[in-house]
A protein has these predicted regions:
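Conserved signature/switch motifs of ABC ATPase nucleotide-binding domains
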Residues: 139, 143
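Conserved ABC ATPase signature
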Residues: 123-130
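Conserved ABC ATPase "signature" region
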Residues: 89, 101-119
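Helical segment within the ABC ATPase nucleotide-binding domain
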Residues: 162-175
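Catalytic Walker B motif of ABC-type/P-loop ATPase nucleotide-binding domains
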Residues: 148-152
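Conserved ABC transporter NBD signature motif
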Residues: 28, 53-56, 60-68, 206-208
Length: 234
């Protein structure tokens, strides 16, 4: 499946008169993995929250062309009293999935994410940070999103889980989903990205496809040359 899943134009946000994001613009294509890179405080999470409607934007527009959106925050938060299985079952019930298909889908995704199904009988608040992150992946993927947004996708994951996550992103893209990864771990996203969007001090300064003409440049070099350049914007 090809085509555009999301278009962002002129997105801006200020806090107490301080500009956090200025005229951000980019698009996400189905079947491709986009890396969203920026230094701490560059505006990555603020941009994501505006795109998803968690934060009111001052100006700009966000156009969704995706049927279903999945989102994994950097630090997932859950009600302290709820068990994992109860939350997943509730998620699927809200989307009208029949009981027999709910159980099947949950088991399938537990296997794909290497998450012990036994954890689902425990409260999510008792999970380790790594399992809580994987559980957040599981909950978001149950609804079969064709736009999947992840803030710091590798945080709290061990090396094996990071490799599982990379395979997951490839599989989603091959299935036609647009995958958007906001991260600091350039070395990990280097192995999976198709497109890159770089933001510096609230401004998107570079949009590039891996296959764009020109000599091959590793992602770390591209990122450093972009954020250190005084006026680069492309």
């Amino acid at each position: 499946m090809s085509g555009t899943a999301l278009v962002v134009r002129g997105l801006s946000k200020s806090f107490a008169g301080v500009l956090a994001v200025k005229d951000a613009a980019f698009s996400l294509e189905r079947g491709r993995i986009t890396a969203f890179l920026g230094e701490n405080g560059a505006g990555k999470t603020t941009t994501i929250k505006m795109v998803l409607g968690f934060l009111r934007r001052d100006s700009g527009e966000v156009m969704f062309r995706a049927r279903m959106v999945g989102y994994v925050p950097e630090q997932p938060a859950f009600f302290s009293w709820i068990k994992g299985g109860e939350l997943l079952d509730c998620t699927l019930r809200l989307h009208g999935v029949p009981l027999e298909r709910r159980k099947e889908r949950i088991v399938t995704w537990c296997e794909r994410l290497s998450l012990d199904p036994g954890l689902l009988d425990r409260r999510v608040s008792t999970y380790s940070q790594g399992n809580r992150k994987k559980f957040s992946y599981l909950q978001s993927l149950l609804v079969s999103p064709d736009l999947f947004i992840v803030d710091e996708p590798f945080t709290a994951l061990d090396p094996t889980s990071i490799m599982d996550a990379r395979r997951l992103f490839h599989g989603l893209a091959e299935g036609g989903a647009a995958v958007f990864l906001s991260t600091h771990l350039i070395s990990e996203v280097e192995k999976v990205y198709d497109d890159v969007v770089i933001i510096r001090r609230g401004e998107v300064i570079l949009r590039r496809r891996r296959e764009d003409p020109g000599p091959p440049v590793d992602l770390e070099t591209l990122f450093l040359s972009s954020v250190r350049s005084p006026s680069r914007r492309a």
